[in-house]
Each structure stands twice: as C-alpha cells, then as structure tokens.
C-alpha cells in the first residue's frame, strides 16, 4: 500500500487531495498545524519534528500543501512567512531524501514579477516583488537543493473547499447590491479539484521538475466575479476598479501581479496532460455549493 504524507491537510488543496485519492489503495498521514480527528499535528518549520514523523512513518510521497498564503499579512510577517514558505519545504525535502520519498511542493504565480505580455512558462526567469512571492521562491530553491525526486507545481487564483474568492463574492452578493473588484489583473482561476487531479496524474510518474498547473484560459478578477454571480443567479453589480484605485482604498495591501497567466508548458511537453478550462472547472465547483 502506498503511503502519502500530506501537510496542510485542512486547507483547500489538502482536502481536494484526500478526496482525489478516495477509494484507492493509499494510506494517508494527514498533518496540519493543529491536531484533530485523523490529523497529526506537525510544525513543518521544526526540522526535528518533521524528521521524527517522517522517520517513523516512512511515507512513499510527501505532498506539501502548507503555506503562509495571506499575501498582505506576509508583508508584515516576514519571519513567519520565511519559516513556513521556505524553511518548511526545506525541512520536508531533507526528510523526503532521507527516506527515499517523492517530494511534491505547491508554489505560486507570485514568483514572477507579473508585468509580462505573454503567458509565463517554467523556463522564464522568476522575479518576485512581494514578501509572499519572495518566500515562496526561496521554498522552491530549497526543494531543488535538498530533494532527490521532486515535483514543484506552480498554481494561481486557487479556490476550493474553504475560504476563497468565490465564496467571498457570494457572501458579499447576499448583503450588497454592488461590489468593487480589480479589473486590470489577469490570471487563470484554478479549482483545487483540478490541481489535485494534476498532482494525482503526475505523482506516480518519473516526470520530475517544475510544472505550471493552472486551469486553461484566463480572465481578470472583475470578470471572474461576474462569472460567479451569473452562475449563482445573482444580480449584484460589479464595479471595475484599477489596482491603483484598490491600493488607495487598501494602503496596507501587497503588490499583486498585473499579469500572472501561466502556461502549463511542461505538462504538455512531458505527456500532453491538459487541465480543464477555468469556466468548466468553475461550473463543476458551483454545483458543489448548491
């Protein structure tokens, strides 16, 4: 029986991973910062704790879904962001190498500066501008340095079972006649379910490396909100605002990529795997909320 250790198992992707493998001959070691039913408490920033658990369980695969993902908070919490987003992946990679486990690490579009004019591929040079992006970039470096067999999946605009943009918009629609949403940031909304499927597809293979993993197609946040409202039958008006206008309304907010469209180039090069169109993935997700 294959044994998989998942960190951040209570997050959007962690939950989707467990659901994706449901019914298969797989044993999960579910970990998160807090202990719970069927969940082992693990502080990934503590190398001794990570090594102790991995040595005891000897998993075949480690999937790191844990991260400090609050982009604005990262600007004020550099130390915490580095510990979770960089040191954590380092510790897991050290442990994975020791027991011969595959290391799967989830990263982000924020490793790019975000001012491009064409989709970023895995071969484009990274240049993060936010604390979140910089700490995630360091996490990638540690994985490459310490893990023998690894997959790094960069994703973007993720939503799933948990707090996310889709649910925030639907909640606002229940109490507001109109909402203001940024219209000049381009990206690819990606469901946690689709990302989990991609990870599941590549995990048994030897196609190691860095992969972009977003749903196909692209949009902007305001248009994404409109697509959500349309599918939910909401009449809430979406006011399109620029990033500059948003920054004035929220001065503590971090810099966000204006253009963060990722091309899943490595997936296409290795075995032709294709993720769903973002509209189709959103349709599937909205049905789960009915």
What are these regions (language model features)?
Residues 220-226, 245-290:
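Conserved C-terminal active-site "lid" loop/helix of NAD(P)H-dependent oxidoreductases
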């Amino acid at each position: 029986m294959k044994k998989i250790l998942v960190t951040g198992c209570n997050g959007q992707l962690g939950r989707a991973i467990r659901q994706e493998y449901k019914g298969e001959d797989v044993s999960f070691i579910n970990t998160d910062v807090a202990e719970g039913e069927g969940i082992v408490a693990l502080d990934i920033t503590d190398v001794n704790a990570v090594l102790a658990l991995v040595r005891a369980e000897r998993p075949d695969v480690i999937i790191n879904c844990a991260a400090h993902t609050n982009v604005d908070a990262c600007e004020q919490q550099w130390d915490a962001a580095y510990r979770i987003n960089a040191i954590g992946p380092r510790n897991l990679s050290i442990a994975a190498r020791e027991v011969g486990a595959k290391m799967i690490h989830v990263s982000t579009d924020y490793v790019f500066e975000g001012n491009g004019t064409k989709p970023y591929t895995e071969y484009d040079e990274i240049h993060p501008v936010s604390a979140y992006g910089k700490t995630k970039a360091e996490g990638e470096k540690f994985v490459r340095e310490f893990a023998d067999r690894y997959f790094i999946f960069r994703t973007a605009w993720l939503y799933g079972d948990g707090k996310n943009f889709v649910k925030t918009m639907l909640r606002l629609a229940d109490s507001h006649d109109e909402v203001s949403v940024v219209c000049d940031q381009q990206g690819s909304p990606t469901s946690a379910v689709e990302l989990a499927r991609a990870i599941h597809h590549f995990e048994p293979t030897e196609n190691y490396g860095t992969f972009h993993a977003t749903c196909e197609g692209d949009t902007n946040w305001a248009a994404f909100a409109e697509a959500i409202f349309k599918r939910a039958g909401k009449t809430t008006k979406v006011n399109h605002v620029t990033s500059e206008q948003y920054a004035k309304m929220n001065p503590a907010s971090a810099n966000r990529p204006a253009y963060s469209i990722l091309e899943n180039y490595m997936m296409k090069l290795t075995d032709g795997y294709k993720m769903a169109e973002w509209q189709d993935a959103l349709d599937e997700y909205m049905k789960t909320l009915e």
